[in-house]
Amino acid sequence: MKQLKSLFIGFVLAALASPVWAADSAGSITITSPANDAVLQSGAGNKLDFNVHLGPNGNHVHIYVDDQAPIVFRDVSHCPCSIDLPKLSSGKHTIVVKEATSSHAMTGVQGSVTATVK
């Protein structure tokens, strides 16, 4: 009976720890600049700074500014990463960085910010 109780406790501990192991193997994307709700200058000269930790299926990232075609960024092994954003018009913009597989399928790992251009 004591062995069975120890075995049960072992299973419970393993089950509780498994979400931690899953989180370690998942990728992550953090946008460091611009901050969420930042105010940017109109025109060119705005940068996007971000960190990427690819998940097991990740190969590169796609960067979206509003509904524009994605910017494919492959050199994520040396992050922190930085790119020049395309020229932005006045108004509110959403910037999303999404992890993609080698065949460009989205993995679900992403980071996003909203910024206003004055």
Language-model segments: what does each one mean?
Residues 23-41, 118:
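Short, compositionally biased P/S/T/A/G/V-rich stretches that sit at domain boundaries
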Residues 71-79:
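Short beta-strand segments within Ig-like beta-sandwich modules, predominantly Fibronectin type-III
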Residues 79-83, 113:
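Short strand-edge motifs at loop-to-beta-strand transitions and within beta-strands
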Residues 85-92:
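Surface-exposed, short loops/turns at beta-strand junctions within beta-sandwich domains
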Residues 95-96:
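Hydrophobic beta-strand segments within extracellular beta-sandwich modules
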Residues 60-64:
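Beta-strand signatures of extracellular beta-sandwich domains
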Residues 42-48:
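Structural beta-strand segments of beta-rich domains
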